[in-house]
Amino acid sequence: MIDSARYPRLARIQTPDDLRTFDESELRAVADELRAYLIESVGKSGGHFAAGLGVIELTVALHYLYQTPVDQLVWDVGHQTYPHKILTGRRDQIHTVKQKDGVAPFPKREESEYDTFGVGHSSTSISAALGMAIARQSEGDDRKIVAVIGDGAMTAGMAFEALMHAGGMDPEPNLLVILNDNNMSISEAVGGLTKMLGRATGSRTLNALREGGKKILGDKKNNPARFVKRWEEHWKGMFVPSTMFEEMGFHYTGPIDGHDMPALLSTLKTLRASKGPKLLHVMTTKGKGYEPAEGDQIGYHAVGPFDPDKGLVAKAGAKKPTYTDVFSDWLCDAAAAEPRLYGITPAMREGSGLVRFSKEYPQRYFDVAIAEQHAVTLAAGMATQGGKPVVAIYSTFLQRAYDQLVHDVAIQDLDVLFAIDRAGVVGPDGATHAGNLDLSFLRCVPNLVVMAPSNEAECRQMLSTGLQHPGPAAVRYPRGTGTGVAAGTDLSTLPIGKGELRLQGSRIALLAFGSTVAAAEQVGRELGLSVVNMRFIKPLDRELVLAVAAQHEGLVTIEDNVVAGGAGSGVGELLNAEGVLRPILHLGLPDSYQHHASREDLLAEAGIDAAGIRAAVLKRWPQLVTGTPPLSAAG
């Protein structure tokens, strides 16, 4: 429960209705308490941190002035919504964020009526809010719809598609878009739009130049009024993004200080009373109010539990490398040997492991902002000219560039390597960030080689294999650390389409893909079963699969992907095509979206940890325990 002595105002707020009982003069104090409570809570639980600190004042002002949940707020991405959750009935549960059965890390419609649209990926808010506004207006409903977009999300093309649609509509939609401009996504925001928005911080200079120009030019009788207007527009276009947004059909206001409560309240009151599409540009500081986060906005984007008095403290001792670390080291080593290699990321330099590469090879490093579609086609263009592009991307974000993968890369059989991080079970970030679909949507793409490593050394070998392969290739690896196998430093490759027999047992064979191999080996040793490290999802090792099928009574496929259309389906299709009849048990992720919980919890729930695999095998073949006669070979 909240400490009412430390947070006397926040303790009185369960819902925005309670917030609205305060006088405007008290909102500054409410915001200060909310910021302090967020620091305390995330310090205990971990979670997304710096973005929420940057929108404290904006969150308070919006819930104070708008009649939420009747008026609807749509938050982009969702990194910044912990303050929103605290003010909308989840204050006393916020310390459970990202935990199993706890508060969701992003807005989730099933969790609260105040979470009007589920998010996790960026740049969807304006489209969703516009759809809401159209639907409401068609019913004669005049409730207010507000989209809050920031943290670099305005750099994505989808946001501009929605802006152009909204601004050109007749009748005009009653929509407010708030651009939370903190010059950050997770890494620093990049691109031409970011530079243009940055000029807006000099708007005071613009105002001075504008007024000075009017006085000088206006005093000259031979200067027509239109010349004064052109002077204004010239400087306006240089310093303020209003020209662009107003050309799209939006009434632009700003920029204003997003931490100035009186200015926010005054401006929002005016905009609330006006009709049509409006855009409010607010300037905020990511990590505002917590000095370590203001100084390291990337490091404090998402954190584990920490002591707010000390900040983040590096853990002593050698750190076990993650798969992301393995990729990072490999990329730099490969770049040293291959001058045609380029590294591409859609705004995920830190998360995807390109920090070192960006420093050592800045001329070959491309952060394209939140533009997954562009990233993939950019790589395709490089490949047509003999380049060796590597696209480092999360599994969940690759979904956004699927057409480009198929149309621009695979159809043309171009030499592009996809390094797919956070594949399979991801964990605390929930359904929006899970990588549980990629094997299914990659396996069906002609020309594409798809690999999944069982350990760190194999990951490095597969990356080298994909780079050397004359065509598109994908290596997908999980979040977190591997099995502890040293990755090495060489650039050796693997024969494409060849797996390996890890354990020779009897009766039943476990055909495991990627990160499930270690658990399969544990079960194989316990029950005396054969274990195959399949390595390749496409092409499958046809000879090995057929040989194993001929030597065993039954097969089990294991993968950290949905069973439907996944790697196990490929094994079944191969056996069916060859006329081989064997009982097959397919183990993998269920036909549902992952909730937020630890990776270990989710693997156990899906039955693809060692205990789950063992239980499933014994349920299907109980004679492995009872000692009853073996199954007769089928077919």
Curated annotation (Swiss-Prot):
Is the keyword NAD in the record? no
The record's cofactor note says: Binds 1 Mg(2+) ion per subunit. Binds 1 thiamine pyrophosphate per subunit.
The kind of enzyme this is, by top-level EC class, is: transferase
The GO molecular function terms of this record are:
1-deoxy-D-xylulose-5-phosphate synthase activity; magnesium ion binding; thiamine pyrophosphate binding
Entry binding sites for thiamine diphosphate: 79, 120-122, 152-153, 182, 290, 372
Specify the superkingdom.
Answer: Bacteria
Co-factor(s)? Mg(2+); thiamine diphosphate
Q: Which UniProt keywords apply?
A: Isoprene biosynthesis, Magnesium, Metal-binding, Thiamine biosynthesis, Thiamine pyrophosphate, Transferase
Reactions this protein catalyses? D-glyceraldehyde 3-phosphate + pyruvate + H(+) = 1-deoxy-D-xylulose 5-phosphate + CO2
**One Pfam short name:** Transket_pyr
Where is Mg(2+) annotated to bind? Answer: 151, 182
Q: Which SUPFAM superfamilies match?
A: Thiamin diphosphate-binding fold (THDP-binding) (SSF52518), TK C-terminal domain-like (SSF52922)
Has the keyword Amino-acid biosynthesis been applied to this entry? Answer: no
Q: Name one GO biological process term.
A: thiamine biosynthetic process
Q: In which pathway does it act?
A: Metabolic intermediate biosynthesis; 1-deoxy-D-xylulose 5-phosphate biosynthesis; 1-deoxy-D-xylulose 5-phosphate from D-glyceraldehyde 3-phosphate and pyruvate: step 1/1
Q: Which GO terms describe its cellular component?
A: cytosol
EC number(s) reported in the record: 2.2.1.7
- Family classification: Belongs to the transketolase family. DXPS subfamily.
Q: How does it assemble?
A: Homodimer.
Q: Which HAMAP family match?
A: DXP_synth (MF_00315)
Q: What does this protein do?
A: Catalyzes the acyloin condensation reaction between C atoms 2 and 3 of pyruvate and glyceraldehyde 3-phosphate to yield 1-deoxy-D-xylulose-5-phosphate (DXP).
Q: What is this protein called?
A: 1-deoxy-D-xylulose-5-phosphate synthase
